[in-house]
Amino acid sequence: MSNLQLDQNGQLRHFLSIQGLNRELLTRILDTAESFSTIGAQHVKKVPLLRGKTIVNLFFENSTRTLSTFELAAKRLSADVMNLNVRTSSTQKGESLLDTLRSLEAMHCDMFVVRHSDSGAAYFIARHVPSHVSVINAGDGCHSHPSQAMLDMLTIRRHKGSFPNLRVAIVGDILHSRVARSEIHALATLGTGEIRVIAPRTLLPRNVESLGVHIFHDMRAGLKGVDVVITLRLQRERMEGARLPSEREYFQLYGLTEEKLALARPEAIVMHPGPINRGIEIESAVADGPHSVILEQVSHGIAIRMAVMAMTMQIPVPEAKEAR
């Protein structure tokens, strides 16, 4: 399934999942993002790399950060951008995903950025587009969110340098989190020293040990000596049945507080993919505190999404300069 992402020369054609991408390719994405990272501070916040290309954002789930940063990334690359409003589209009249796709293809689009509640939706679209069209997965069900993982890897690399000596803890709703799956694969591929997952048994997927992680049900034990803490949103909308007694009890056991964070290394950083539920996954004193790099993650999302857009379009990326 991962081979669909690469062309015959091993270059990115689609960006659907971290799985199947090697360390060299992930590092190239990070390095390419670095070349775009200063564009937002320039007087002219554009480079002409995708001028004349048309990118369609197909978001079948709600989004703030992901949609806005993909749109901004495309515009900073000088692409033409169309956001499909699913609530007012013909999908509300029963039109199938494939028929929607074919209609958009007839408009000669060059890339689809897709978010969908069904796992595998981005792969389905990638299998049905013409060879010149690229697909980027902006989140599919509980399966994958590769660009979020890569913006988090960029954030970690900027603060911590290399990965092999790091201890990283991922805390919370691992079971329903596409972010967690992508983070684990990215951290493992980049050679992270130790990956910990901290969660109640009811919020862990089966056979999670096979991903090479260390499991902790006691948050305090799991946070001891870690360099990076990634907290996850509690995804009530994806839960079936009673997975938790109450949000209050969840916060007592798995909410990140200053007291619990003190068990990590003194220079530890705190991350969250958003949206944040304050008082459930994390307290405000931590989310807004000196260890938090949550807003940096959002900023890095633009550079990462510029990088994967340029790379999947197979556009050579020179040193970033202002558009003329």
Swiss-Prot record:
Record protein name field: Aspartate carbamoyltransferase catalytic subunit
Keywords: Pyrimidine biosynthesis, Transferase
Reaction equations catalysed: carbamoyl phosphate + L-aspartate = N-carbamoyl-L-aspartate + phosphate + H(+)
Binding positions for L-aspartate per the UniProt entry: 93, 178, 233
NCBIfam families referenced in this protein's UniProt entry, alphabetically: asp_carb_tr, PRK00856.1
Gene3D superfamilies documented for this protein: Aspartate/ornithine carbamoyltransferase
Alphabetized SUPFAM superfamilies for the sequence: Aspartate/ornithine carbamoyltransferase (SSF53671)
Pfam families (alphabetical): OTCace, OTCace_N
Record note on quaternary structure: Heterododecamer (2C3:3R2) of six catalytic PyrB chains organized as two trimers (C3), and six regulatory PyrI chains organized as three dimers (R2).
Similarity annotation: Belongs to the aspartate/ornithine carbamoyltransferase superfamily. ATCase family.
Root EC class: transferase
HAMAP family: Asp_carb_tr (MF_00001)
Enzyme Commission code: 2.1.3.2
Entry GO MF terms: amino acid binding; aspartate carbamoyltransferase activity
GO CC annotations on file: cytosol
Biological process according to GO: 'de novo' pyrimidine nucleobase biosynthetic process; 'de novo' UMP biosynthetic process; amino acid metabolic process
Cystine pairings recorded for this chain: none
Binding residues annotated for carbamoyl phosphate, in chain numbering: 65-66, 115, 145, 148, 274-275
Gene designation: pyrB
The organism of origin for this protein: Nitrosococcus oceani (strain ATCC 19707 / BCRC 17464 / JCM 30415 / NCIMB 11848 / C-107)
Functional note: Catalyzes the condensation of carbamoyl phosphate and aspartate to form carbamoyl aspartate and inorganic phosphate, the committed step in the de novo pyrimidine nucleotide biosynthesis pathway.
Pathway where this protein functions: Pyrimidine metabolism; UMP biosynthesis via de novo pathway; (S)-dihydroorotate from bicarbonate: step 2/3
